[in-house]
């Protein structure tokens, strides 16, 4: 890249330092003469007589630094000082017009293209007055139509000559997602109130027409990215004029449906900071032909989906909005462009849906994943301690809740409580309450039946399995067995023992009959074989349910204590009960929550008195 050279000539306009750039369209008065001047100063190969045919054209009035008819214009900079790293047309080897200038009263994005064009941030302010205090006015017809038709042909020949010298003109477009290598990125910034020279424009000897400040203040925010890349990449003056923008009657610029606009404030001014506006002009340097308008509009949202900064935008913008320009980093500075409502409205429907899907995955990805897995709860179960004060003691109600939490698959803590030395903090936690009780996210729950209902309602699918029964009869099966056992084991009279034993056997037989009776879903209506004996593992089927968590701990106690103190065992002909117990002993949810046999025997040592 050639070094920047100091301009040899100063602006022939007002001597004051203007604050804005003047833009003249290729078809406007003075355009051909301006091209001639640039060609003579920038490239020796360009013919000098190209602009002579349009010398009689009058310079057009510009509002806010932008052509009223919306044409792509040439930019004349007032600041003769080149920005750092900026190329001058004389040394770059590819002089050309500074195209697609977009101006704003406070902050402006000016896409520029030409030979060796780089990314550049341009800050512009309101234009100054000319020597007479106001800009010369020319009728609109004179601005829109060239007086000499040869001027357009001369401009096209000049452009073709310049393209031959500088290669294919790079496309210039607003691309908020893609940022080129460091070598291709040039950010020229100036303090507020000072102008900057636009890249690719002559640094001296050019004509300029300062603008009245009153007119500049009335101009609304100029559009950003309003022109297609083809218009900014060496399109002919006639094509650029045909695709130009129209102005509203009040001076506001209307954007085409496929063009994105920058959201302006109440006064119509863009409120983005100078360093927040970025212009991408040169990413597609090898692209030599124009792209279709619809294709370009569809490509813009897709670039956001594949951009390298997609993850950085999402971290910084939790709301997941990718509809505006994303933040850019320059050196140690980071800035973010304010989102535009107009930009969101102008985004194509397909692109918007894709962005929405990306936002949903990226911003809410970890959150959605966590939501799918379910919220972790702080659960502590307090159970009765054994005789040693530490191990799990004999308590069918404690084991019932222990099994439910285990089957739910929830993370929980188990604390054994020694009733002989109950800590003061536990007495304050649940005063007057013996285990089992539970704390769920800091809330104390003491009623076993209500705890069971609460856990079934709180810990639900898809993460936590449903433990309720499908057949209501399963909930009441064996509900009288434990009461019959208690009466049997506490009886001390030998003559009454047979009566209590028969009552217990009657209750066990009823339970065995239910376990051997096939459930409705075990019977196949289309099968020729009749199912007379059930083969299910548990009360309600092949999976453990809340009914099993209630009955199995009691059956296990009956089996241990009755044999130890009364020599009573479940009859072998009760195949349903034995199948039920054997399947339960094969499950960790049951065996790992059972107290030791010695603990069970020790608990009934006093209750099971010898018969007299």
From Swiss-Prot:
Motif (G-site): 395-398
EC number(s) from the headed UniProt entry: 1.8.-.-
Topology in membrane: Single-pass membrane protein
Gene Ontology CC terms: chloride channel complex; cytoplasm; plasma membrane
CDD domains, alphabetized: GST_C_CLIC6, GST_N_CLIC
Residue pairs linked by disulfide bridges in the UniProt entry: none
Listed Low complexity bias regions: 84-96, 208-223
Activity regulation, per record: Channel activity is redox- and pH-regulated. Inhibited by IAA-94.
PTM note: Phosphorylated.
InterPro entries reported for this sequence: CLIC (IPR002946), CLIC_N (IPR053823), Glutathione-S-Trfase_C-like (IPR010987), Glutathione-S-Trfase_C_sf (IPR036282), Glutathione_S-Trfase (IPR040079), Thioredoxin-like_sf (IPR036249)
Catalysed reaction equations from the record: chloride(in) = chloride(out)
Protein's UniProt name: Chloride intracellular channel protein 6
Lineage: Eukaryota, Metazoa, Chordata, Craniata, Vertebrata
Encoding gene, per UniProt annotation: Clic6
């Amino acid at each position: 890249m050639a070094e920047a050279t100091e301009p040899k000539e100063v602006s022939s306009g007002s001597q004051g330092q203007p604050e804005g750039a003047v833009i003249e369209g290729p078809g406007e008065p003075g355009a051909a003469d301006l091209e001639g001047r640039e060609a003579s100063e920038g490239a020796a190969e360009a013919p000098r007589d190209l602009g002579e045919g349009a010398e009689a054209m009058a310079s057009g009035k510009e509002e806010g630094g932008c052509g009223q008819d919306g044409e792509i214009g040439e930019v004349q900079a007032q600041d003769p000082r080149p920005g750092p790293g900026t190329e001058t047309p004389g040394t770059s080897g590819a002089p050309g017009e500074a195209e697609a200038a977009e101006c704003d009263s406070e902050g402006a994005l000016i896409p520029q293209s030409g030979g060796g064009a780089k990314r550049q941030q341009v800050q512009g302010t309101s234009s100054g007055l000319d020597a007479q205090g106001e800009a010369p006015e020319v009728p609109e017809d004179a601005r829109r139509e060239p007086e000499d038709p040869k001027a357009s042909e001369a401009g096209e020949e000049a452009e073709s000559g310049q393209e031959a010298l500088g290669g294919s003109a790079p496309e210039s477009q607003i691309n908020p997602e893609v940022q080129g290598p460091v070598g291709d990125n040039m950010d020229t910034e100036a303090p507020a109130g000072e102008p900057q020279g636009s890249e690719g424009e002559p640094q001296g000897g050019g004509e300029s027409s300062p603008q009245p400040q009153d007119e500049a203040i009335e101009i609304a925010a100029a559009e950003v990215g309003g022109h297609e890349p083809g218009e900014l990449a060496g399109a002919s003056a006639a094509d650029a004029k045909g695709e130009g923008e129209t102005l509203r009657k009040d001076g506001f610029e209307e954007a085409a449906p496929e063009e994105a606009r920058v959201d302006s404030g109440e006064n119509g001014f863009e409120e983005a900071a100078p360093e927040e506006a970025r212009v991408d002009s040169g990413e597609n340097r090898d692209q030599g032909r124009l792209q279709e308008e619809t294709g370009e509009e569809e490509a813009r949202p897709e670039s956001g989906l594949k951009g390298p900064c997609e993850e950085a935008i999402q971290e910084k913008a939790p709301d997941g909005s990718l509809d505006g320009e994303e933040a850019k980093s320059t050196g140690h500075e980071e800035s973010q462009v304010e989102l535009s409502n107009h930009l969101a409205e102008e985004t194509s429907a397909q692109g918007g849906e894709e962005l929405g899907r990306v936002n949903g995955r990226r911003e809410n990805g970890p959150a959605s994943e966590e939501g799918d897995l379910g919220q972790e709860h702080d659960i502590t179960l307090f159970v009765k301690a054994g005789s040693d004060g530490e191990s799990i003691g004999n308590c069918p109600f404690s084991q019932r809740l222990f099994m439910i939490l285990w089957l739910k698959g929830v993370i929980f803590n188990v604390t054994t409580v020694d009733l002989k030395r109950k800590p003061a903090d536990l007495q304050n936690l649940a005063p007057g309450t013996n285990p089992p009780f539970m704390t769920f996210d800091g809330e104390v729950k003491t009623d076993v039946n209500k705890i069971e209902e609460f856990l079934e309602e709180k810990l639900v699918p898809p993460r936590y399995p449903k433990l309720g029964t499908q057949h209501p009869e399963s909930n009441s099966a064996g509900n009288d067995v434990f009461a019959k056992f208690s009466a049997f084991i506490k009886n001390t009279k030998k003559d009454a023992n047979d009566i209590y034993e028969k009552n217990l056997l009657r209750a066990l037989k009823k339970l065995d009959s239910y376990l051997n009776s096939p459930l409705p879903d075990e019977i196949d209506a289309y099968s020729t074989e009749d199912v007379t004996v059930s083969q299910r593992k548990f009360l309600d089927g092949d999976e453990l349910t809340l009914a099993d968590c209630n009955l199995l701990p009691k059956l296990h106690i009956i089996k241990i204590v009755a044999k130890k103190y009364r020599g009573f065992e479940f009859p072998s002909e009760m195949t349903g009960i034995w199948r039920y117990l054997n399947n339960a002993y094969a499950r960790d949810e049951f065996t790992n929550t059972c107290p030791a046999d010695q603990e069970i025997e020790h608990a009934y040592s006093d209750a099971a008195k010898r018969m007299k």
